[in-house]
Amino acid sequence: MSIALTGTPGVGKTTVSKILKKRGYDILDLNRFLKERGLLGEKDIHRDTFEVDLERMKKVFEKENLKVDIIEGHLSHHLSVSTAVVLRCAPPVLKERMKSKGWKKEKIEENVEAEMIDAILIQAMETSEEVFEIDTTELEPSQVASSVEDIIGGKTEGYEPGTVDWSDELL
């Protein structure tokens, strides 16, 4: 069964998945999958994002019965996966990453808030059998990729849900 590599936009999923691909893992870019199959809905101009019908996404994915090691994308934890690895990043660092990419203020605020309140982690815990999290804030992408490999190999200590806490950022 596939593993979801998920997290708030900007935490490093795509960069880490490219490293894992070079290390021999079969990676599915979920955003590309959605685009190629016409599963992106209306574009929300204010949020600079596309709407996605999650039920339709799941049905199309299951129908295709793809065999991949890792599904990368901020919606990947909504698919039928045994394990979700949630990449996390300290909100101030995440905000700077998004600014450097030229993202709109509203999109930055929405995603930083989602990271602060553990939105993706909570969703993943509701939809996946096993969930682990990795704080990418001070790690190089290759180190994050190695942590993902540790989890795949069964070395999960220190990656349990709740090990990353941004509640101080809310004060």
Where are these regions (language model features)?
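Hydrophobic anchor at the beta1->P-loop junction of P-loop NTPases
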Residues: 5
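P-loop (Walker A) phosphate-binding loop of NTP-binding proteins
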Residues: 8
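ATP-dependent small-molecule kinase phosphotransfer cores
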Residues: 25-79, 163-165, 170-171
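A glycine- and Lys/Arg-enriched "phosphate-lid" helix/loop adjacent to the NTP-binding pocket
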Residues: 42, 89-132, 138-139
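Short loop/helix-cap segments at secondary-structure boundaries that form the rim of catalytic
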Residues: 76-82, 125-126
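NTP-dependent small-molecule kinase module
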Residues: 125-171
